Amino acid sequence: MEKPVRFPDVMLLAAGHGMRLRPLTETIPKPLVPVLGVPLIERVMAVARHEGATRFVANAHYRADQLLAHFGGLLKVNREPELLETGGGVKAALPMLVSDPFFVMNTDVFWLPGADRPLSRMLARRQTDAQIVLLCVQPGRATGFARSHDFCLDPHGRVTRDWGAPVIYAGVALLGKDHFAETPDGPFSLNLLLDKALEDENLVGVVLDTPWFHVGDVGALAETERILSA
């Protein structure tokens, strides 16, 4: 009997200061900010677990001890003495990631578990090792996002700058360790990898088919809680 394929690891980006969520983040790290009593990072992990994720790795910097204490050793955490940004944070944690490819998830965005299964569709969409798959959301389904859009998605599911349907990057990417082979040591943004994949026509997208919440500031937190309480 063929051995079932294990769901990829999930890398959780959890190192930022969360300045726009002050005063809440003056005493707790941003991933532990509660939304209707549930910490943001737990909401993100819940949507991944619903699709089969079992192994999570996070980076931490600001109030890292609180994040470690919250999970009591149940979450693998790579502590950053200095902020490494999104790309540098993932690269530093690569030795802790077992699967290849793996998911990278922001810890300030989520949707309701069971409302859609986008991670599984992202896995099915990735056809070559060179591809990076982004989770995208239509602007009309987004809460807490100030800009009109990030990218466009053409009829074939390819991500472009300006041709196709406007979409927002929903804070989830599926990529491989080889994408980091020629990246710098130290801080850098994941945008470095996305720009390269876009230039090489290796950036593709999957559209989330349910409301999406971005809790980036106190206003977005209040609006998200209002919607979820309705």
Task: Give residue spans per PLM region.
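Conserved N-terminal catalytic core of the sugar/cofactor nucleotidyltransferase
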Residues: 1-12, 20, 34-112, 116-117, ...
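Catalytic-core segments of class I nucleotidyltransferases/pyrophosphorylases
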Residues: 103, 110, 114-127, 139-143, ...
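Short alpha-helical oligomerization interface
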Residues: 26-30
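Cofactor-binding loop segments of dinucleotide-utilizing enzymes, especially the Rossmann-like FAD-
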Residues: 15, 61, 107, 137, ...
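Conserved beta-strand segments of alpha/beta enzyme cores
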Residues: 31, 74-76, 202-204
